[in-house]
Design a protein with these regions (language model features):
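Short beta-strand edge/turn micro-motifs at domain boundaries
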Residues: 142-167
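Sequence/structural signature of outer-membrane beta-barrel proteins
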Residues: 130-134
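Beta-strand secondary-structure signal
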Residues: 122-128, 148
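A short, structured loop/turn motif at beta-sheet edges
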Residues: 112-122, 151-158
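Bacterial N-terminal signal peptides that target proteins for export
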Residues: 1-10
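Short, low-complexity N-terminal intrinsically disordered segments enriched in polar/charged residues
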Residues: 22-68, 161
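Bacterial N-terminal signal peptides
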Residues: 9-19
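A solvent-exposed, acidic/Ser-Thr-rich amphipathic alpha-helical stretch
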Residues: 37-44, 59-119, 126, 136-142
Length: 167
């Protein structure tokens, strides 16, 4: 009888353990789905801000899109690193080309490949753009640009660019 009782106790504890594990996994799934939905909404907010800031070319607005330690590989020359240098680079570009105007900025989010892991997200896709260097210049539409963007979730739940590279 003692041996049977030990087996029943072990079976009961194993069943209880499995049940609690399954229950906690099932209970965590909605939390993970909620977090994923919140991340997607916050990333979409960054996308909209990116489009607005790029079209206006406001240096302060463009700077707000970046994490404090962001790296921009899109400027001519060496990479621009850090929020302070990012702001200076945008202001310098605006001063050098005061009539520069973005006529079209259209990242293709429908075909963009993306993944979110913890506080990081990566996006790889294409962007179409048209711009004018001055008011009298003809519009320039470079070929579709392939870019890679690394996003970093901020402590407030928002997302900012951590690294942007163009190919």
């Amino acid at each position: 009888m003692g041996r049977n009782m030990a087996l029943v106790t072990i079976a009961f504890l194993a069943g209880l353990s499995i049940g609690l594990t399954v229950r906690s996994t099932v209970a965590a799934a909605p939390e993970q789905q909620d977090m994923h939905a919140a991340n997607l909404a916050a990333i979409e907010k960054l996308h909209k801000a990116d489009e607005e800031c790029t079209l206006t070319q406001d240096p302060k607005c463009l700077t707000t899109l970046w994490s404090d330690d962001g790296i921009n590989l899109g400027f001519p020359g060496p990479p621009v690193v850090g929020i302070k240098d990012m702001g200076e680079a945008y202001a310098k570009f605006r001063a050098q080309y005061p009539e520069f105007q973005v006529l079209k900025y259209a990242p293709d989010y429908k075909t963009m490949q993306s993944a979110i892991v913890d506080e990081w997200a990566i996006e790889v896709g294409y962007t179409d753009a048209t711009f004018k260097m001055s008011a009298n210049a003809a519009p320039v539409s470079p070929p579709r640009t392939k870019d890679m963007r690394l996003l970093k979730r901020q402590s407030d739940g928002s997302w900012k660019f951590a690294l942007v590279g163009l190919k």
